[in-house]
Amino acid sequence: ELQSQTYVAQLKRNRSKYQKDLAAKKKQVEALNREIERIIAASMRGKGTGKIKQPVDMKLDSEFSKNKGRLPWPADGPVVDHFGLHYHPVFKSVKLPFNNGVNIALPKDAPVKAVFDGVVKQIVVMPGYNKCVLVQHGNYFSFYCKRGSTAVKPGDKVKTGQIVGTVDTIDGMNQLHFQIWKGTTPQNPELWLR
């Protein structure tokens, strides 16, 4: 009986600590998403029309769109967190922050590759995510986060399969956080990758 009470008390403490950690993580996720939306919105402004004017970008947009379900994975590893809303595996009533992408478990320093031809729009450093690279493909964007080294810089043209950086250990985990956006709307990456 005493053992059960001790276990319940420990679970309650863990839940409280986890909820505090989760609140901090939620703030990081929200900050990351706001920054992505800001960068994308700025990239897409074209004389008030919201469309990109350069023909090269529109060609990339069309080619990217045609490759839905056929893009290569940015790294070789298992998906450990999927797109969307999920609940904590132990505390079933606790919602995790909405995931606008997928998290892929990888060894430290594993290479991260561009999923399609594009232009590096920006490299952002975000708390909890380290270095993040945003690549533009017309009206589409791919986002590679939780990275250690960076092999590209803003303005660089990248090719499908080109290494854009490596994965770093953050919060004790070696994971790539990967997102795909169409304009300012996040897409489920698993529907785009083969």
Model-derived features: positions:
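Generic structural motif
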Residues: W73-D81, A110-V120, G161
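Short aromatic-glycine-enriched beta-strand elements
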Residues: P89-K92, P97-N100, P127-L134, N174-L176
